[in-house]
Amino acid sequence: MRVLYLLFSFLFIFLMPLPGVFGGIGDPVTCLKSGAICHPVFCPRRYKQIGTCGLPGTKCCKKP
């Protein structure tokens, strides 16, 4: 029975996703912490999209 707990813990750690592997920014707090802005529809001129701000159509934009 103890072996099952050990097995489950190893599987959990092994299958846990790594940060940064599945894309960039996905919420407004992370966007603002990275020094970017949330902007609807498209990024302004001279800004580059680095993620989304959680809502559909809202982009996280940062100056390159």
Swiss-Prot record:
One of its GO terms (cellular component) is extracellular region. It holds the Pfam family Defensin_beta. Keywords: Antibiotic, Antimicrobial, Defensin, Disulfide bond, Secreted, Signal. GO terms for biological process: antifungal innate immune response; antimicrobial humoral immune response mediated by antimicrobial peptide; cell chemotaxis; chemotaxis; defense response to bacterium; defense response to fungus; defense response to Gram-negative bacterium; defense response to Gram-positive bacterium. Its main location: secreted. Monomer. Homodimer. This is Defensin beta 4A. It comes from Homo sapiens. The gene is DEFB4A.
